[in-house]
Curated annotation (Swiss-Prot):
Protein name, per record: Quinolinate synthase
E.C. number: 2.5.1.72
The species this protein was found in: Burkholderia pseudomallei (strain 1106a)
Main location: cytoplasm
Keywords: 4Fe-4S, Cytoplasm, Iron, Iron-sulfur, Metal-binding, Pyridine nucleotide biosynthesis, Transferase
Amino acid sequence: MQSAIKSVEYDRPLAAGAACGVGEAWAKVPDALAPDERDALKARIKALLVREKAVLVAHYYVDADLQALADETGGCVADSLEMARFGRDHDAHTLVVAGVRFMGETAKILSPGKRVLMPDLDATCSLDLGCLVDEFSQFCDAHPERTVVVYANTSAAVKARADWMVTSSIGLEIVADLHARGEKIIWAPDRHLGGYIQKKTGADMLMWQGSCLVHDEFKGIELDLLRREYPDAKILVHPESPEGVVALADVVGSTTQLIDAAVKLDAQRFIVATDLGILHKMRLAAPGKTFIEAPTAGNSATCKSCAHCPWMAMNALSNLADVLERGHNEIFVEAAIAQRARMPIDRMLDFAARHKQRVQASGDLQRDQALFANVGAA
């Protein structure tokens, strides 16, 4: 399969609190497949998963064909943390992670004895690219009195530099707990999610200035215009979005919680401000309801991501089949880094086990709003 190369610009912070520069990366864009090619690859992948004693673990943002394959073969389609938990607890010898690189690394850290493969090792994340370990470590060293809290969307090396790793599902609770104990915090890398948590908790947080290139593109002014066009629609927003977008939301939540909201709430129409890959699962979970993509650019403007992560798009049927056939693209994490990175991950998991209860929505938006204030994993 031939792949086009797409240039991708992303926020490139040099230090927390500093103005962002612009970084440039690239992503491969797989060619579209004919229906018979798709069907043949799906059948081949199913056979290879059995042969390799492997399980497919896919993120909500990857191609719908990969999500369907994971569901059909006893795998998992989930947010980043549940992907890692599922892989850790599954008895398969090989985990095939369809997502971006930090997800594969986290799976390997939690399952060091398993083989972890990815369709494309170059599938990365703007948050990861925008928070390099050497620069981040220098900033942390300049503020040794602060507790370092990093989001899941970071490299294993950055996690190894942290005191806590959080997903958005538990980030509010952990930061609130640290704040109640009088701790001051360094937060990285997503400035929008960090600002949302800071506003909710009142914590003293120094922010790294990274952003998700998909969510950073959503526009509050255009979203408000779309809301006026569809006044009956409820607005579902991921908290990596800018503050002006979050302010318009009926529900702020993770991928999992936004899907839950689409199912539980009485509305028949939703405007969705997150990666459009989620629409596959939303339509399956809430058939008959209408989902409208939130705008990612203003009048006459050109979107960069157009609401779909270019690196998530690198996961394709063809390279999934190839990695299972050849056994390449294996994820390795240096032992010392993995050992250090496991500590902040385990702290989060232990905290979650002690405190977290599954969010259940009743369908009453006024009653459920407090539930959705505690957002879920990316």
